[in-house]
């Protein structure tokens, strides 16, 4: 019997997840299908119960449901609970179990371009929203010891740091102070929507004085190279856009559902083609 998987969100027509997962199923000769479900906020509970009744094997959760979905699940993974958001649900033994692969996917993506372990790196996170929270907790869970958070509202950065129970040395900074201190970091991670199409001329931090070998990663992938990445490249930095994070979080969900590891490079090239790269 064909296994059913999917993604719920609103809007959902733009999602690249069906193309990526269905290609992986076909490549691995698996009898499965991944479908995008448009689910409005007011019917989220009914939709989740319906998917469970249909026997869906697993599904992803995207905007605006990542927090609200938690009220309709049977179990939530401790890391997802700490992050406060779920983006992947596994249907196992009659239970819907929620996970967050966004942060772990980002960590795996970052490790893929770092020639050294992340644990000893000094990291700066730009932004203190949901994406930053997932990445912060996942980096801490991976053993990173030094993560500073810069945000337009410093109090929000302080709240994010205070919520983490892991042993991490962290300082909350203004974006102005982070700009001045950028040369002291090994990795800078841009987690806000600043620089996303159509406001491509904007950047949360002017790159001007990076040390040699710095990695600058931006979770945005439209455009492929945001202003911060262009500036970092001019400084000789190793740069990474959001495609890697998207692919790795999807691959991790795929692995959780099926027990099979998909071909990451195949997934990545497919997504790049679909985005017109």
Curated annotation (Swiss-Prot):
The keyword Transmembrane helix does not apply. Pathway: Metabolic intermediate biosynthesis; chorismate biosynthesis; chorismate from D-erythrose 4-phosphate and phosphoenolpyruvate: step 4/7. Shikimate binds at residues 15-17, 62, 87, 102, 221. Keywords: Amino-acid biosynthesis, Aromatic amino acid biosynthesis, NADP, Oxidoreductase. GO terms for molecular function: NADP binding; shikimate 3-dehydrogenase (NADP+) activity. NADP(+) binds at residues 127-131, 151-156, 219, 242. It catalyses: shikimate + NADP(+) = 3-dehydroshikimate + NADPH + H(+). SUPFAM superfamilies: Aminoacid dehydrogenase-like, N-terminal domain, NAD(P)-binding Rossmann-fold domains. GO terms for cellular component: cytosol. Its EC number is 1.1.1.25. It comes from the Bacteria. Involved in the biosynthesis of the chorismate, which leads to the biosynthesis of aromatic amino acids. Catalyzes the reversible NADPH linked reduction of 3-dehydroshikimate (DHSA) to yield shikimate (SA). This is Shikimate dehydrogenase (NADP(+)). It comes from Bacillus thuringiensis (strain Al Hakam). The gene is aroE.
């Amino acid at each position: 019997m064909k296994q059913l998987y999917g993604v719920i969100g609103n809007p959902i027509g733009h999602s690249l997840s069906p193309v990526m997962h269905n290609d992986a199923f076909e490549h691995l000769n698996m009898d499965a299908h991944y479908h995008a479900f448009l689910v409005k906020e007011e019917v989220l509970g009914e939709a989740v119960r319906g998917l469970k009744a249909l026997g869906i094997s697993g599904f992803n959760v995207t905007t605006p449901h990542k927090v609200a979905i938690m009220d309709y699940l049977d179990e939530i993974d401790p890391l997802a609970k700490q992050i406060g958001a779920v983006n992947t649900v596994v249907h196992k033994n009659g239970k819907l179990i929620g996970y967050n692969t966004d942060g772990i996917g980002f960590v795996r993506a970052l490790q893929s371009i770092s020639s050294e372990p992340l644990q000893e790196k000094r990291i700066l996170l730009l932004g203190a929203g949901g994406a930053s929270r997932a990445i912060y907790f996942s980096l801490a869970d991976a053993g990173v010891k030094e993560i500073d958070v810069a945000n337009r509202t410093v109090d929000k950065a302080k709240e994010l740091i205070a919520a983490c129970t892991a042993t991490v040395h962290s300082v909350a900074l203004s974006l102005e102070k982070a700009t001045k201190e950028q040369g002291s970091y090994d990795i800078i991670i841009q987690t806000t929507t600043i620089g996303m199409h159509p406001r491509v001329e904007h950047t949360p931090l002017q790159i001007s004085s990076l040390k040699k070998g710095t990695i600058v990663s931006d979770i945005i992938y439209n455009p492929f190279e945001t202003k911060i990445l262009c500036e970092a490249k001019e400084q000789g930095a190793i740069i990474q856009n959001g495609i890697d994070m998207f692919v790795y979080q999807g691959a991790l969900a795929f692995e959780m559902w099926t027990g099979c590891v998909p071909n990451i490079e195949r997934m990545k090239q497919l997504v790049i083609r679909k985005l017109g790269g």
